[in-house]
């Protein structure tokens, strides 16, 4: 589905491979000279923490937070090649806040953990899409870490964009989990409890 659409949403529970699949497609498109760069981003909200409260400079704050993106890259490319591509700005990993004002052309763009965007952040990110680019938005609407009363940008995007031609929505469920078999059981238990 990613290959057939310029904008794809991958929505589902933890462990379904949403981020890995998106990054693997991006790496494949780059290797086949179909995009010039890979841009990976996440909102700076995670389980109640914000970057400003973490110790160190911006790189110290951002790198651990972006670790899941690095891990998915490491499943697709050798470490030395990742380092070289990062140095040459072929791969860019940056917080969502750094995307404002940009046009992302000739790129494969991934927004991970999109359930933690606000409606305005999501709109801002989606409107960065430039010519000859593909964008994948991944998230889990059951793991929203935003303050109470703030609607998730992912939830609002699903509602607003569900009927827009050319936008693809791929929905995963607990049956799609590829992590440890206990993850499926945990997700199902929470689904039952939350009903």
Predicted regions and their residues:
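Conserved helicase motor core of SF1/SF2 NTP-dependent helicases
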Residues: 1-111, 115-195
């Amino acid at each position: 589905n990613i290959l057939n659409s310029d904008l794809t949403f991958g929505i589902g529970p933890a462990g379904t491979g949403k981020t890995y699949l998106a990054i693997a497609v991006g790496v494949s498109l780059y290797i086949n000279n179909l995009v010039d760069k890979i841009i990976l981003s996440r909102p700076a909200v995670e389980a109640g923490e914000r970057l400003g409260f973490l110790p160190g400079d911006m790189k110290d704050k951002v790198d651990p937070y972006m670790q899941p993106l690095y891990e998915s890259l490491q499943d697709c490319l050798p470490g030395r090649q990742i380092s070289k591509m990062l140095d040459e700005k072929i791969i860019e990993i940056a917080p969502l806040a750094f995307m404002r004002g940009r046009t992302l052309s000739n790129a494969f763009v991934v927004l991970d953990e999109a359930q933690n965007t606000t409606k305005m952040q999501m709109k801002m990110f989606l409107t960065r899409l430039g010519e000859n680019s593909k964008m994948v938005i991944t998230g889990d609407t059951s793991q929203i870490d935003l303050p109470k009363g703030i609607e998730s940008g992912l939830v609002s995007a699903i509602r607003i964009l569900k009927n827009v031609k050319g936008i693809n929505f791929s929905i995963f469920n607990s049956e799609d989990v590829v992590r440890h078999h206990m993850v499926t059981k945990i997700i199902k238990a929470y689904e039952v409890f939350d009903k």
